[in-house]
Amino acid sequence: MMSAKNMVKVMIVMFAIFLLAKSDGKPVRKRSVSEIQLMHNLGKHLNSVERVEWLRKKLQDVHNFIALGAPIFHRDGGSQRPRKKEDNVLIESHQKSLGEADKADVDVLSKTKSQ
């Protein structure tokens, strides 16, 4: 059997463990930012700095290009709209014949002709 002194010591130790462990799985104190979070933030910052530097270089190129008075040309004319109605006509090789037309195209054409 245990003596009363040993029983008191055991009870004090158990009480201390109970008080320290009663945190429901959460840390008793707020933890500081971990090294992983710091590295993540550093990576995002370096990526942001790299993007800003790239954009600054591109804007500097555009500024220099305009400052020289060079005309601006569009690639493939894809972003330009036709200036005249005649420029909007399809090339014969790209036009569909009536046999190749989709059923939806024929329906739309028949509805517009009837009006």
Swiss-Prot record:
Residues 1-25 form the signal peptide. One of its GO terms (molecular function) is hormone activity. Residues 26-31 form a propeptide. Keywords: Cleavage on pair of basic residues, Hormone, Secreted, Signal. The keyword Signal applies. One of its GO terms (biological process) is magnesium ion homeostasis. GO terms for cellular component: extracellular space. PROSITE patterns: PARATHYROID. SMART domains: PTH. Its main location: secreted. It comes from the Eukaryota. Residues 51-69 are annotated as: Important for receptor binding. The keyword Repressor does not apply. Interacts with PTH1R (via N-terminal extracellular domain). This is Parathyroid hormone.
